[in-house]
Amino acid sequence: MEQKLDLRVIKTQNNIKNTFIQLLHQKDFQHITVQSILDKSLINRSTFYKYYTDKYDLAESIIQDILKEFSFFLDERFSGKEKDDLLPIIKNVYDKSYEEKDILSALWTINTDSIHLYDDMQQLLMDKYKFYMAKPAPANKDLFNYKACIYASLVMTTLKYIFDNNDPNMSQKIIENFNFSALW
């Protein structure tokens, strides 16, 4: 019986999250209210507050899940594999991101003091680059930080480009035509 309850909870939370993402595509975050989420998701107020304290908590919850998965992909990407082994991993990250482009692009539009997914992803890319590429210690720390910044910017710009072109094969085209040796 408890498994049914868990399934209902999952369905309810997914309904709330999906409704929130739909609303982000229709209006700015500041104009979304809990009431608009309730109306569109067809749930009552107590159900919403059972899981989230407000729309900020909802957004942060979704973002934390995304960052956790993104971090996992980055750990795999930096796992010490050879260049030929990396290309399928990198393509997988781009493809998975493309599958989630509606969610990511909606959440990228939020930029508050506490919610800024695009910047968080870029910072995570920089941090992972620095952590994994710092062995052995870089000869020039300033240039090392610059490379980390360029790497993060390149990945985020590539993701945005893939989303904007709305072509499911774009990641393959990029992987085939880009020389990753400079930063990868």
PLM feature segments, named:
Residues 83-99, 149, 157:
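Amphipathic alpha-helical segments that line or abut small-molecule/effector binding pockets
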Residues 15-22, 40, 57-77, 88, ...:
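Alpha-helical structural segments
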Residues 23-57:
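Helix-turn-helix
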Residues 1-23, 27, 36, 40:
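Basic, helix-initiating cap at the start of DNA-binding domains
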Residues 131, 152-153, 157-184:
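C-terminal peripheral helix-coil segments that are non-catalytic and often amphipathic
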Residues 111-137, 142-149:
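Amphipathic alpha-helical packing segments from all-alpha helical-bundle domains
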Residues 3, 24-27, 139-143, 158-160, ...:
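Cytosolic nucleotide-binding catalytic cores of signal-transduction proteins
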Residues 92-122, 160:
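Amphipathic alpha-helical segments used for helix-helix packing
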